[in-house]
């Protein structure tokens, strides 16, 4: 059984729901967490109190996606070089 015949047996409403879940899941687990990482990396030392509070709230809300990328991203400071 090939993919086109399998997809033709599934109702269109079900396919739309699966597409919506995929898009929302991708936004929740990939797009927004990467945007948050980029925003925090760019503005870490210039954030105001309210901006930092909002970013921390979004980190709490998007924590599953943040934890997926945490092992692969390194935002440590460069340091003084060889001492």
UniProtKB/Swiss-Prot annotation:
It comes from Synechococcus sp. (strain CC9605). The chain crosses the membrane at residues 15-35, 53-73. Belongs to the complex I NdhL subunit family. It catalyses: a plastoquinone + NADH + (n+1) H(+)(in) = a plastoquinol + NAD(+) + n H(+)(out); a plastoquinone + NADPH + (n+1) H(+)(in) = a plastoquinol + NADP(+) + n H(+)(out). InterPro entries: NADH-quinone_OxRdatse_su_L. The gene is ndhL. Pfam families: NdhL. Its EC number is 7.1.1.-. NDH-1 shuttles electrons from an unknown electron donor, via FMN and iron-sulfur (Fe-S) centers, to quinones in the respiratory and/or the photosynthetic chain. The immediate electron acceptor for the enzyme in this species is believed to be plastoquinone. Couples the redox reaction to proton translocation, and thus conserves the redox energy in a proton gradient. Cyanobacterial NDH-1 also plays a role in inorganic carbon-concentration. The lineage of its organism: Bacteria, Bacillati, Cyanobacteriota, Cyanophyceae, Synechococcales. It is found in: Cellular thylakoid membrane. It is a multi-pass membrane protein. GO terms for molecular function: oxidoreductase activity, acting on NAD(P)H, quinone or similar compound as acceptor; quinone binding. This is NAD(P)H-quinone oxidoreductase subunit L.
């Amino acid at each position: 059984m090939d993919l086109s015949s399998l997809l033709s047996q599934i109702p269109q409403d079900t396919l739309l729901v699966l597409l919506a879940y995929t898009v929302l899941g991708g936004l929740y687990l990939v797009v927004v967490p990467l945007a948050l990482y980029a925003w925090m990396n760019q503005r870490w030392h210039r954030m105001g109190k309210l901006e930092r509070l909002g970013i921390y709230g979004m980190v709490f809300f998007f924590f599953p996606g943040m934890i997926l990328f945490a092992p692969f991203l390194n935002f440590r400071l460069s340091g003084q070089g060889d001492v």
